[in-house]
Amino acid sequence: VDITDLLEKNESYFGLGRFEMDLGIGTYVPESSFLKEVCPAAKSLTIRFVRTCMSVSPFPDPSVKSEPTRWEYGVSLCLLDKIPMEGRMIDGRVGYFTNKVRNYDNAVYDKGECEFISRWKLVPHREQLEAYLGGDLVEPIKPIVFYIDKQIPTWLYPYVKRAVEAWQPAFERAGFKNAILARPEPTYAEDSVFSVDNARYAYISYKTSPLKNAYGPSSVDPRSGEILCSHIGIFNSISDL
């Protein structure tokens, strides 16, 4: 299947169209835009683009000339497991992040919609299942691992790592030890397929910016609510709040 036209257009799946207002950009300039590289990995594909768009002022002024702006970014495509994790429906009595999807099997969902709790998939090793069910702490097959931006100041790294792993006691109450870990961003020699753009990796990025903010969205499997990855952004001025 030839998808060249789909990749070259500045549409919602691979383009910047839905971010125009946030980025302050307007008209797409295709002749100055290109697909930079395609990076395949196990069950995933990362595509990097360079797009050129004209700038747009939030307060239009005819005397101000629109200038071209160039943006480089990545898009990650991942192959989901054939059999999804068993989803857990929302319970309005407890606050959770959720993901609502329309389900067309009305024999199961009368309202045509289902809303799953967003949660990580933690599963004990088969040989430890009996111990897990007996109340012993066991390590999950696939722990939650957050990689920390190599650009983060050296003095700040141990505090970010400690903040991530401070959640371990909560997972221990669910029967898992060492369920959530923080590690430094690997070098190419350590992991040749690692990419910040790859949705298979949870990542904490460091932003050198006067903006006093932080964010932490996650990508989930719509079939079950399984959290596939999370990308946390920390701005260096957040300490000024």
Description of each model-found segment:
Residues 151-179:
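Zn2+-dependent metallopeptidase catalytic core
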Residues 1-152, 170-174, 185-241:
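Auxiliary tRNA-acceptor-end handling modules of aminoacyl-tRNA synthetases
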